[in-house]
Regions:
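Transmembrane-helix motifs of polytopic, lipid-linked glycan transferases
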Residues: 70-79, 194-217, 255
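Membrane-interface transmembrane helices that cradle and orient dolichyl/undecaprenyl
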Residues: 256-271, 302-309
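Transmembrane-helix signature of polytopic, membrane-embedded enzymes
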Residues: 193-194, 210-232, 251, 264-274, ...
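Interfacial juxtamembrane loops and adjacent helix segments
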Residues: 132-187
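Membrane-interface alpha helices of multi-pass inner-membrane proteins
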Residues: 52, 213, 226-227, 271-286, ...
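Transmembrane alpha-helical segments
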Residues: 104-112, 289, 487-488, 517, ...
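Short acidic/glycine- and proline-prone juxtamembrane loop motifs at membrane-interface regions
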Residues: 235-248
Length: 693
C-alpha cells in the first residue's frame, strides 16, 4: 500500500526482482529503452527547431546536431539508467512488454490511416505547409516577393497561419516550430507521404512516456489500463493521425514527469536537469505549454516543494529555463504575429510567473515561514476541503452547469451554419464551454470520468495531508489545466477540433488518477473477507474504462481524412514543373486560393501568390513578362474564370475527392462527410490575349 515516507513523500510500490539471482543474470532493458527513445524525441525537437531558426535546415545540418545533442543527453542519463535497471518480477516484465506492444500498435495502426491535412484551413495545414517551406527553403523567414511576384501591386501571399508584419516583408508561420521541423525531417527522409505520418510515431512515444510515468504513480497493471484507455480514446486516435502538436506536448510532458520522479528517488541533480529540459520543451512544442510550466514552476518552488524534491528542484528549473530560452527566441523572433494574437494570453501568464516568484520569495522570509507552519497545522482539514471541492465541482460541471448556463464571449465565430444544422438558435458568440465536462464524458465514458474524479480527489487529499511534494508537479498540472479548460476551453467549439484542448494534460492526467485509485482499492480489498465482490466490481470498472471509448472510436477505426491529397499534390507539382510560377484567383464562393497558395508554394517549391478576380489582363501579361525563364500559370476552380483572359488551354492540376469527420457542436461527431477540391491551371501567354477594343 502507498505510504508516507519520513519526509512525508507519498511512495508507491516499485517492481521488484523475482529472486536475488535474477539481479545478477538479467538486467531490465525497459528503463534504458524508454530513455533512449525519449532522448531521441527531445533532441530531435530541439535540433530541428534550432537549425530551422538558423535558416540552414536540411538533413545534412539537422542530423549531426541531433546526433550530438542525443549523445550528450544520453550520457547525462547514465546514472538514472544504471540506478533504475534492476530486474522486475515476471508479471511486471510481461506488463512492460504489453505497454511497448500497445505503443508499437498505435504507431502502425494510426500510421496506416494518416489524416493528410495539407490545405491551410486550420492548424494542421499550417504545420504541414511550414514543414514544406523548411524542406524547400531551409528557414522560417519566408521570402515570397520573388520574381515574378516581386512587384506586389495587387498581389497577396498570406494564408491561414501565414502572415506578414510589413508590406513586402517575409511571411511568418504561426505557432511554435519544433513540430513542423520534425515533420520536415521525416519529409526529407521519405517524402510527403511520410511527413503526414510523423504524428503516428510521436503518438507511440507519448503512450510509452505516459505508461512509464504511470507505472511509478500506480501499479504497472493499472498504468497499462490507463495506457490502453488513452490509446483507444478517439481524441488521441484522431490527433495521432492528424498533424497537430498536442502529441509532441503530451510525450515531452510525461517524459519530464517520469525523469523528475527518478531524479527525486535517486537524489540526482543531473537527471533533474534533463527532466527540466523535457518539461521546458513543452513550451518549445506549444505556446500553451507555458500554462503547464507555470503549474510546474509553482510545484518546484516554496511553499510546495520540500524534502527530496527540494534538493533537485533548482536543477529541474535550470533545465526548464534552458528549453524556454529556445522557445522564447522561436516565439518572439520567428512568430511575431502569433505573439500579437495572444497578447491577452501572454500578459496574464507573465504576471502569473512573477507572482509565483514573489510568493516563493515571501515564503522564505521569517514571517513567511511562520505563516506556512500555521497553515500546515490544518493541512488535513484543508486536504479534506480540497478533495470535497473537486468532487462537488466535477459533479456540478457535468450535471448542473450545462442545464443552467449558456456561455458566450466577446467575439463571434463561424459556427452559424452548424447551429442551423443542429436546429439551434444562431448565436455565433456561444462558446459551449458550459458543456465541456460532458465533452470528456463522450470520449472517456462516464465510468472512467467518475473513477478519475474520485482518484483525482483522493490523490490531492493524500498529497496535501502528507505533504507529498513528489507528485506536486503532476497534480498541479493536471488540476490547473483541467479546471482551466473545463471552465473556458477558449477555442472554436466545433468537435472534434475543440477536444484537442484536453489531449496533452487533461485526459491522460485524469486517466492516471483513475489508475491510481483502481490500484489502491484493489490492494485495500486484498485479504479481506469481501475481496471477491470488491475485486469483481473493480474488474468491471477496469473493463468499462478500457472498452467504453470504443463506442466512439470503433465505428471510426479506419478514419483517414483527406486521403490521397499528399500524392495528388506531388502529381500537381509534376504537372506544373519546376519552372512554374502560380497565381491563384480569389473566386467568389470558393476558398481555394486561401487553402492552396502556400501548400503549393511549399511542397512544389515554386513562386506563388493570389489575387482578386478584378486583376486586369495587362497586369497578368506584365507578371508573365517578369517571370523570365518561368511559365506563369493562372489557377482557378471554375473554368469560367479563364474566359477573356490571356491564357492558353486550361488543364487539371489537382482533382481531389475524400472524406472528413463531420463538425458538430452539441453532440459528438460520428458521421463522415464527403468533399471535393478541383484546381485548374492555364498558362498566361501574350499570344492568347483577347484583341484590344
Amino acid at each position: 500500500m502507498p505510504a508516507a515516507s519520513g519526509e512525508g513523500t507519498l511512495t508507491v510500490d516499485r517492481p521488484q526482482p523475482s529472486s536475488p539471482g535474477a539481479a545478477a543474470s538479467r538486467r531490465s532493458l525497459f528503463v534504458p529503452a524508454v530513455w533512449l527513445l525519449l532522448v531521441l524525441e527531445l533532441t530531435w525537437a530541439i535540433a530541428g527547431v534550432a537549425v530551422a531558426m538558423a535558416g540552414v535546415f536540411s538533413l545534412a545540418t539537422v542530423v549531426p546536431v541531433w546526433a550530438a545533442l542525443a549523445v550528450a543527453v544520453w550520457i547525462a542519463t547514465r546514472p538514472a539508467r544504471a540506478a533504475a535497471s534492476a530486474p522486475a518480477d515476471r508479471s511486471t516484465r510481461y506488463i512492460r512488454a504489453a505497454a511497448f506492444a500497445v505503443a508499437v500498435a498505435a504507431v502502425v495502426i494510426n500510421g496506416a490511416f494518416p489524416g493528410e491535412h495539407l490545405q491551410t484551413g486550420r492548424d494542421g495545414g499550417t504545420y504541414t505547409a511550414t514543414a514544406g517551406w523548411l524542406m524547400s527553403d531551409g528557414g522560417l523567414l519566408m521570402n515570397v516577393t520573388v520574381p515574378p511576384f516581386d512587384d506586389s501591386n495587387g498581389l497577396r501571399y498570406e494564408a491561414a497561419g501565414f502572415h506578414e508584419t510589413v508590406k513586402d516583408g517575409p511571411l511568418y508561420a504561426q505557432f511554435m516550430h519544433a513540430f513542423p521541423s520534425m515533420m520536415a525531417t521525416t519529409g526529407e527522409l521519405a517524402g510527403l507521404d511520410a511527413l503526414v505520418r510523423t504524428n503516428a510515431l510521436l503518438g507511440g512515444l507519448a503512450l510509452l512516456a505516459f505508461y512509464a510515468f504511470g507505472e511509478r504513480l500506480a501499479r504497472p497493471w493499472a498504468a497499462l489500463v490507463a495506457q490502453l484507455a488513452l490509446a483507444l480514446n478517439l481524441v488521441f486516435v484522431y490527433f495521432t493521425r492528424a498533424p497537430f502538436s498536442e502529441l509532441l506536448n503530451l510525450g515531452l510532458l510525461f517524459a519530464g514527469f517520469w525523469a523528475l520522479d527518478q531524479a527525486v528517488e535517486q537524489h540526482n541533480r543531473i537527471t533533474a536537469y534533463v527532466a527540466g529540459l523535457f518539461l521546458g520543451a513543452t513550451f518549445v512544442a506549444r505556446l500553451d505549454g507555458l500554462v503547464v510550466l507555470l503549474m510546474i514552476v509553482l510545484a518546484l518552488l516554496p511553499p510546495f516543494v520540500r524534502g527530496r524534491m527540494a534538493r533537485v528542484a533548482p536543477a529541474a528549473l535550470a533545465g526548464a529555463a534552458t528549453s524556454c530560452v529556445l522557445a522564447l527566441i522561436d516565439l518572439f523572433v520567428f512568430a511575431p504575429v502569433y505573439v500579437e494574437l495572444h497578447v491577452q494570453f501572454l500578459v496574464p501568464l507573465g504576471i502569473g510567473f512573477v507572482l509565483v516568484g514573489l510568493i516563493a520569495a515571501g515564503v522564505m522570509t521569517q514571517p513567511g515561514r511562520r505563516a506556512v507552519r500555521a497553515v500546515l497545522r490544518y493541512r488535513r482539514p484543508i486536504a479534506t476541503g480540497l478533495a470535497a471541492t473537486i468532487v462537488v465541482a466535477g459533479v456540478f460541471a457535468y450535471v448542473v452547469r450545462p442545464e443552467v448556463q449558456i456561455d458566450t464571449w466577446a467575439r463571434e465565430m463561424p459556427i452559424g451554419v452548424l447551429q442551423q444544422r443542429e436546429g439551434q438558435v444562431v448565436n455565433e458568440s456561444r462558446t459551449y464551454a458550459e458543456q465541456s465536462a460532458r465533452w470528456l464524458g463522450w470520449y472517456m465514458g462516464w465510468p472512467a470520468l467518475a473513477v478519475a474524479l474520485a482518484g483525482w480527489a483522493g490523490l490531492v487529499y493524500r498529497s496535501v495531508a502528507q505533504r507529498a511534494s513528489r507528485w506536486a508537479p503532476f497534480l498541479l498540472a493536471t488540476s490547473g489545466l483541467t479546471m482551466l479548460y473545463i471552465t473556458r476551453p477558449t477555442i472554436t467549439p466545433d468537435h472534434i477540433w475543440a477536444d484537442r484542448r484536453f489531449l496533452p494534460v487533461v485526459i491522460p492526467g485524469l486517466l492516471l488518477c483513475a489508475a491510481w485509485l483502481l490500484a489502491r482499492l484493489w490492494r485495500l480489498a486484498a485479504g479481506r473477507a469481501w475481496h471477491l465482490p470488491a475485486h469483481g466490481a473493480l474488474a468491471i470498472a477496469t473493463g468499462l474504462i478500457v472498452l467504453m471509448p470504443l463506442g466512439m472510436t470503433g465505428p471510426l477505426t479506419d478514419l483517414r481524412e483527406e486521403a490521397g491529397l499528399a500524392r495528388e499534390i506531388e502529381v500537381a507539382c509534376e504537372r506544373l514543373g519546376d519552372d512554374a510560377a502560380i497565381l491563384l484567383l480569389d473566386e467568389e464562393g470558393t476558398h481555394m486560393h486561401w487553402r492552396m497558395t502556400q501548400p503549393l508554394r511549399a511542397h512544389c517549391g515554386i513562386p506563388a501568390a493570389w489575387t482578386e478576380p478584378e486583376i486586369t489582363n495587362q497586369r497578368l501579361l506584365a507578371l508573365a513578362a517578369r517571370a523570365r525563364d518561368r511559365t506563369l500559370y493562372l489557377l482557378a476552380e471554375d473554368p469560367a474564370s479563364f474566359e477573356g483572359r490571356p491564357v492558353g488551354d486550361h488543364f487539371v492540376v489537382l482533382a481531389h475527392r475524400s472524406i472528413r469527420l463531420e463538425q458538430t457542436l452539441s453532440v459528438p461527431p460520428r458521421e463522415l462527410e464527403s468533399y471535393g477540391l478541383d484546381v485548374l491551371a492555364a498558362p498566361v501567354t501574350p499570344a492568347s490575349a483577347p484583341p484590344a477594343g
